[in-house]
């Protein structure tokens, strides 16, 4: 199983947990609000366009999307959010990147540091683990939706990098700047992705066993549960995640 497939596995699990906890709307609204700072017109703001597409995929009401955009542009009052990226290590030397959006920087720093230390990890300095990851666009589509040759032609013509078959799915990788064009080309061909977002993909993965693996899972869950956390990335072997999670 490839590295990015392992990433997709945990993201699917994470998405299901988020939905259960009723947190996904909050995270999406924050992303729309932050994105809209660069302009409220999605046609001229790729990040906002991606955020709106993600919200619509989760059936967020249009009114919620509109209000989030207006808070970002300043048309409506609202919390002033700051984006913070944390880097650190989990149990067994697993590299972890946490992306947070908060209206209270000091609180967020304190609580994220505590989450690491309580679960066998430690918060690191900026760029301490970033070099272990690559920022990539990831688009996952069902093999039932398109054959390899057709999809490969779509991907390459739109500027994508790679197409891999993983189980029942095709996984498309792009550079971040090409992501928007590739995902649009896929949708224009009548293919709806199961996953479509810009993410961080680890270059290598770390396997853990037993109590250390369980502790790493607790760290990931604690971070993902935090109200300010938008995304958590790690190079914890995702096959191990499946085994530990059962």
Curated annotation (Swiss-Prot):
Q: Which family does it belong to?
A: Belongs to the TACO1 family.
UniProt-recorded name of the protein: Probable transcriptional regulatory protein ACP_0521
Q: Which domain of life is it from?
A: Bacteria
Q: What is its main location?
A: cytoplasm
Output the NCBIfam families linked to this UniProt entry.
PRK00110.1 (NF001030), PRK12378.1 (NF009044), YebC/PmpR family DNA-binding transcriptional regulator (TIGR01033)
Q: Tell me the keywords, alphabetical order.
A: Cytoplasm, DNA-binding, Transcription, Transcription regulation
Question: Which sequence ranges are marked TM in the entry?
Answer: none
Where are the disulfide bridges?
none
Question: Which cellular components does GO assign to this protein?
Answer: cytosol
The answer, when asked if Cell cycle is one of the entry's keywords, is no
Keyword Transcription regulation appears in the UniProt entry: yes
A single BP term in Gene Ontology? regulation of DNA-templated transcription
Q: What GO terms are given for molecular function? A: DNA binding
Q: What compartments host this protein?
A: Cytoplasm
Organism field: Acidobacterium capsulatum (strain ATCC 51196 / DSM 11244 / BCRC 80197 / JCM 7670 / NBRC 15755 / NCIMB 13165 / 161)
